[in-house]
Amino acid sequence: MAEATDVVLVGGGIMSATLGVLLKELEPSWEITLIERLEDVALESSNAWNNAGTGHSALCELNYAPLGANGIIDPARALNIAEQFHVSRQFWATLVAEGKLEDNSFINAVPHMSLVMNEDHCSYLQKRYDAFKTQKLFENMEFSTDRNKISDWAPLMMRGRDENQPVAANYSAEGTDVDFGRLTRQMVKYLQGKGVKTEFNRHVEDIKRESDGAWVLKTADTRNPDGQLTLRTRFLFLGAGGGALTLLQKSGIPEGKGYGGFPVSGLFFRNSNPETAGQHNAKVYGQASVGAPPMSVPHLDTRNVDGKRHLMFGPYAGFRSNFLKQGSLMDLPLSIHMDNLYPMLCAGWANMPLTKYLLGELRKTKEERFASLLEYYPEANPDDWELITAGQRVQIIKKDSEKGGVLQFGTEIVAHADGSLAALLGASPGASTAVPLMIRLMHQCFPERAPSWEDRLKELVPGYGIKLNENPERADEIIAYTAKVLDI
C-alpha cells in the first residue's frame, strides 16, 4: 500500500532542505516527506569537507567575468551571481531572525581575494577592477599591485615570494565562508519540528507515473532487504546532487531525454595546524590554467568548520565513474542510453582540451600537486598538509541542435511540462544560489500558486523582485540588515 504525501524531496542536501523550508513557509498545510539514501542529511556534496564553502558572490571568482575577444570585461554574469547570493543571504537572515534556525554559526565573514602572478593576468585584473568598481554590489572592492598592501591582506601568500614576480590582487572584506552542511542540518531540524517526515537509509528503486498523474516511488531500506516503502505524491523533487541524473532517467519524463553527465572528483590539500591557519584569513582565488574547466580555478581558503579554522588549497581534478562520493562505479556506464549517447560523444570530441587536462591531472604525483600550492604559498610545509577527496561533481551534458551535444557548466532545472516533477542538475555556484534556484523552480512548477506567495516571499526575502545593484539605497539597507543578523 502506497503512503500518500503532497511532496516528496529526494536527497538530503541543501537543495531539498531549501525547497522544503520554502514550501513549508508558503504552503504550511502540505505534507512533505524527505528521502535520503545515507544515514543522515548533508553527508554528500553539502558536507563541509565535500565543497569549498565559498559564498559565491562573484567577488573573487575570475571565471565569472572573462576578458572578451574585444578586450572588454562584461560584469553582467558576475552581477547576476552576486544578486542571487544576496537573495540566499536575505532568506537565511530571515530564518535566523524568526528563530527558525538555531543560530548564524553556519556563515562566517571571510574576505574574498583574487591573486594573479604574471603581467598579462595583472593587466586583466586591473581591467576587471575598473569594470567592477562602478557597480553597486562591487563598490567596496579594492585593487593593488603593492606587495606590502597585498601582504597585509594575505601574509602567507607573499612571504618567500620572488621579489621580481609581478603580482596584483583584488580584495573584498564582505566575503563569506559558508558551512552548507551545518545550514542543511539546521533547516531539516526545523522541518522535522514542523511535521516533515524524514526517511533515512532509503534508496529509490523505481519511479512510475500513474494514470491520475500521481508519482509513485518504490524505495528500499539499505540496511534491511525487506524494508520496502512505497510513496505516492503529486509533486516530486529530485535534488540528489550527482544522483539526480539517474533518478531523472528513471522517471522517464520526455524533458529529461538527451541529458548526460560527466563526473569529476575534487581533491584538496587541507591544513589543520592552528599556527598556520591563524595567519591566513581570506578565500584567495587565482586564474585557471589554459584548457582547465571553471571548477579547477585554484584557491587558498580559510575554512571554519565546527568552530575550528583550517586552510584548504585546490581543487585538483580526479576521476571516478560514480556520480556520488558514496555511489557506484557503475553510475556513469549505466547512465549512457541511446538518447544521450550521441550528445555525450559530441561533447567529448568538442572538449578534447578538457580531456587532456583531466588526464594530465590524473597522472600528477602528490609532489607535483604540492608544487601548485607552493605557487600560492611559497613557504608551505608538506608535513602540515593532507590530501583529501571532496565531493563528486557531475557536469551536465545536453543535446544541442547545432553541435549535437554540449558540456554545460552551472546548474539547470529540468521539469515536466505539467510541473509535477523537477530535477536539479549540475554544480557550481550551486549551494550559494539555492534560494533563488528553488524559488524559480516553485514558480515553474506551481504557476497557479505563485500570486498567493508574493507577500510571504517579500517577508522571507526583503529585496524579492529587486535588483540590488540598480537600487543603491535599498541595497545599503538590506545588506546592512543581513550583515547584522548573520554577524558578518
From Swiss-Prot:
Gene3D superfamilies: D-Amino Acid Oxidase, subunit A, domain 2, FAD/NAD(P)-binding domain. It is an enzyme of class 1 (oxidoreductase). Signal peptide: none annotated. Its EC number is 1.1.5.4. Its cofactor is FAD. NCBIfam families: mal_quin_oxido, PRK05257.1-1, PRK05257.1-4, PRK05257.2-1, PRK05257.2-5, PRK05257.3-1, PRK05257.3-2, PRK13339.1. GO terms for biological process: tricarboxylic acid cycle. This is Probable malate:quinone oxidoreductase. The keyword Oxidoreductase applies. It comes from the Bacteria. The keyword Repeat does not apply. InterPro entries: FAD/NAD-bd_sf, MQO. Belongs to the MQO family. It catalyses: (S)-malate + a quinone = a quinol + oxaloacetate. The gene is mqo. It comes from Neisseria meningitidis serogroup C (strain 053442). Keywords: FAD, Flavoprotein, Oxidoreductase, Tricarboxylic acid cycle. Pathway: Carbohydrate metabolism; tricarboxylic acid cycle; oxaloacetate from (S)-malate (quinone route): step 1/1. One of its GO terms (molecular function) is 2-hydroxyglutarate dehydrogenase activity. PANTHER family: L-2-HYDROXYGLUTARATE DEHYDROGENASE, MITOCHONDRIAL.
